Swiss-Prot record:
Organism of origin: Aliivibrio fischeri (strain ATCC 700601 / ES114)
Residues spanning the signal sequence: none
Protein name according to UniProt: Guanosine-5'-triphosphate,3'-diphosphate pyrophosphatase
Protein's job: Catalyzes the conversion of pppGpp to ppGpp. Guanosine pentaphosphate (pppGpp) is a cytoplasmic signaling molecule which together with ppGpp controls the 'stringent response', an adaptive process that allows bacteria to respond to amino acid starvation, resulting in the coordinated regulation of numerous cellular activities.
EC number: 3.6.1.40
Domain of life the protein comes from: Bacteria
């Protein structure tokens, strides 16, 4: 049976200090689609002794894992494969013994990369999969090293790899497995001491947003969501989780809502490192990145994706995949932007609100690929279910709720954490108006309108003669005015003479 050749496949393998990961993707419609993610907990760093000699047992765990990965690599062109080793393999004195057998198992050579190169590839993975403007701080806490990067767009401006990680900090500060204040204090202090040499450089550069790109950060976010918190990580939430952990005497007893058994062993050490980073760098908040080292390796093999804006690339790929009417989507987008600008540049409070509104206008008909009758419901489902690089979970939730309400179904927006409640309300009002005004799907047939706002009362001024000649649009606008007004969002339709 022939293997599929419909689009090129790529694979990246990361031999981390805590886990080995394999990512398989394909390049399709100008975007990257994940085909497989394989992870095995190897805890390679735990096999290092005081002389940095890797134990045979740890090496065997690694070889056993690579034997599994080798099967999948057989299906992928050699030139589309990247395999890297990180912190533990950088320091292991007997690394050659491990690599000789590992290379034989895989049929490919492993490249042990330096810490700065690891940081560079992590940043590329973040830049290609995470949205946001301005300068950002990226934090990746691994098993034996922690990378911190400041960059903007696709350019990294500061790259650091520090010799601390959740496995090494576990052995260094929680060796007795006691979840005491003393152990936490020592672990946090040790992390701050390790961070101190870079403090001045990083605070001088500064950043607008902070993202975490590691299993540690992902695990913490999952715990917060399981406990009813939002996805934004703050120091107060980290301290809250520390208090929860300290209610248990020993690590083996740890049972926090949302914490998986797989992550429990390195939870206190990873948490301590992140608390130290928050406190020393005075970080307000952190969100989870869409990718890191493995994604950076994959995107680095695909030349045409090197400098595309992430969110726009995602939108374009999704439009192609679901055969959306791109010209009409752009008409709705242009009118939405015009209506927002008429209400004032600061009417949508957060800077990310307008880009999110334009994403909604570009994708609002996606649910119609399933069924017209429940198009909004299907749109919401797809937006939340799809992998959309550049958009956080909270942003996908907001987009889904906007698109659920873009047509017949109408209600106030539910609680969400991507923008303020008032901005979400205003985004929905604009979206619905823009769709009604463009329903003939021809820019030459759309009316000239002026939208004004005072105390959240919207007044839509439109030519009376045009309304008389387009009775369906007039009727839909009148119905929309009633709907918005009935839930407290007053909308007035003003027919100009």
């Amino acid at each position: 049976m022939k293997s599929s050749t419909m689009s090129p496949m790529y694979a990246a393998i990361d031999l981390g200090s805590n886990s080995f990961h394999m990512l398989v993707v394909r390049h399709i419609n100008g975007s990257v689609q994940t085909m497989a993610k394989i992870k095995r907990k190897v805890r390679l760093a735990a096999g290092l002794n005081e002389n940095n000699t890797l134990s045979h047992e740890a090496m065997q765990r690694g070889w056993d894992c690579l034997s599994l990965f080798a099967e999948r690599l057989q299906d992928i062109p050699v030139e589309n494969i990247r395999i890297v080793g990180t912190a533990t393999l950088r320091v292991a004195s007997n690394v050659d013994i491990f690599l000789e057998k590992a290379n034989q198992i895989l049929g490919h050579n492993i490249n042990v990369i330096e810490g700065e190169e690891e940081a560079r590839m992590i940043y590329q993975g973040v830049a290609h999969t995470s949205g946001g403007n301005g300068r950002r701080l990226v934090v990746d806490i691994g098993g034996a090293s922690t990378e911190l990067i400041i960059g903007e767009g696709f350019e990294a401006q500061a790259l650091t790899s520090l010799k601390m990680g959740c496995v090494t900090w576990l052995e260094g500060y929680f060796k007795d497995r006691a979840l005491t204040q003393k152990n936490f204090n020592a672990a946090i202090a040790g992390a701050k001491e390790t961070l101190a040499p870079i403090l001045q450089q990083y605070t001088d550069l500064g950043w607008q947003t902070c993202v975490g790109a590691s299993g540690t950060v992902q695990a913490l976010q999952e715990i917060m969501l399981a406990q009813g918190m939002d996805e934004v990580i703050t120091l107060a939430k980290l301290k809250r989780l520390q208090k929860q952990a300290m209610q248990y005497e020993h690590l083996e007893e740890l049972d926090i809502d949302g914490l998986t058994l797989e992550r429990a062993l390195v939870f206190p050490s990873g948490l301590s490192i992140l608390i130290a980073i928050f406190e020393l760098l005075n970080i307000d908040s952190m969100t989870l990145a869409g990718g890191a080292l493995r994604e950076g390796l994959c995107y680095g093999m695909i030349d045409e994706l090197q400098h595309d804006e992430v969110c726009q690339r995602t939108i374009k790929s999704t439009q192609q995949r679901y055969q959306l009417d791109v010209d009409y989507a752009q008409q709705v987008t242009d009118l939405s932007i015009q209506l927002v600008q008429q209400c004032g540049n600061d009417w949508l409070i957060e800077p990310q609100a307008l880009p999110l509104l334009t994403a909604a206008t570009q994708l609002h008909e996606i649910g119609m690929c399933i069924d017209y009758k429940k198009g909004g419901e299907h749109s919401a489902y797809l937006i939340n279910a799809l992998d959309l690089p550049g958009f956080t979970r909270a942003q996908k939730h907001l987009l889904g709720e906007l698109l659920r309400r873009y047509r017949e179904y109408f209600s106030a927006m539910p609680t969400q954490h991507a923008v303020s409640d008032i901005s979400a309300q205003r985004m929905l009002r604009i979206l619905r108006l823009a769709i009604i005004l463009t329903h003939r799907r021809d820019v030459n047939l759309a009316p000239t309108v002026t939208l004004s706002e005072k105390n959240d009362v919207l007044s839509l001024s439109i030519d009376g003669a045009w309304l008389a000649a387009n009775p369906l649009t007039r009727s839909e606008l009148e119905i929309e005015a009633d709907k918005q007004t009935n839930i407290g969002w007053e909308l007035v339709i003003d027919a100009r003479d």
